[in-house]
């Protein structure tokens, strides 16, 4: 073996040793950084947990986490150490998402995360079988997961002012205890089938959507006593509305109604109705009243107005029928002479 070959082999061996050492050094540095980052995360979680604990109160026997107007874009996993919480009240915190571990808070009764920037509801929400109220209004939610139907204790659901929700999964009809539903200021073009099939629903707000017509099956909501449909594009009301025997409040202001169906006279439980700002084909003026307060102003297009309109509509129809029959009558008289 020549001297140069020996020298080359020695250099290669030294090079391998140094490369191995450099590689090991880089790995050690990487592990050290990861360890430091882990320590930082642990420390931050502890600090966050300490801050969160300061926000926990007990009111009326409930353990409540209440945060208002403080920045919490995400919630740390250390929050799981407070899994006995029964109520979350987090408003105007900039919260971007509901944590995936939400399903582990089995004692939650109220989850109010309104006025944040949440874009989706995690499927784990369906694990909250004790949840009675879910308030997610004023967020950026576009869809609702079918897993929400597993929240079998849910009584109140508010999704108002998310602006982009246009439908609900049919599985939500399984929410047998839901009595209150707010879907106002979204993009619904019709009342979802899931809503029509909610057996206990008593209060529904679908104002400020894009509803153009109401389904004939509207009367399936037999328990409904309050229905808000203001600021839509509704052009007519189905005859089946007369079957909604429990309906006491009906708001239809700012729509495109041209008529009020006579069958609404049969709705004897109706106590408040509003037809203001609709292009109704008949002009009806109520008799003057001494009362000049705000309630009287509302009544101008309220229950008394509705009954007066229906009566006027019938009178107009009778007059038209009379006029259409008159020529044939005159013709008959002429033949008899």
Swiss-Prot record:
Pfam families (alphabetical): LRR_14, LRR_8
Chief localisation class: cytoplasm
UniProt xrefs under InterPro entries: Leu-rich_rpt (IPR001611), Leu-rich_rpt_typical-subtyp (IPR003591), LRR_dom_sf (IPR032675), LRR_domain-containing (IPR050216), LRR_R13L4/SHOC2-like (IPR055414)
Source superkingdom: Eukaryota
Subunit organization: Interacts with MYH7 (via C-terminus).
Biological role stated in the UniProt entry: Component of the sarcomeric M-band which plays a role in myocyte response to biomechanical stress. May regulate expression of other M-band proteins via an SRF-dependent pathway. Important for normal contractile function in heart.
Annotated protein name in UniProt: Leucine-rich repeat-containing protein 39
Tissue: Expressed in heart and skeletal muscle.
Lineage: Eukaryota, Metazoa, Chordata, Craniata, Vertebrata
PROSITE patterns, alphabetized: LRR (PS51450)
Subcellular location: Cytoplasm, Myofibril, Sarcomere, M line
UniProt KW Repeat keyword: yes
Chain positions of LRR repeats: 84-105, 107-128, 130-152, 153-176, 177-198, 200-221, 223-244, 246-267, 269-290
Gene this chain is encoded by: Lrrc39
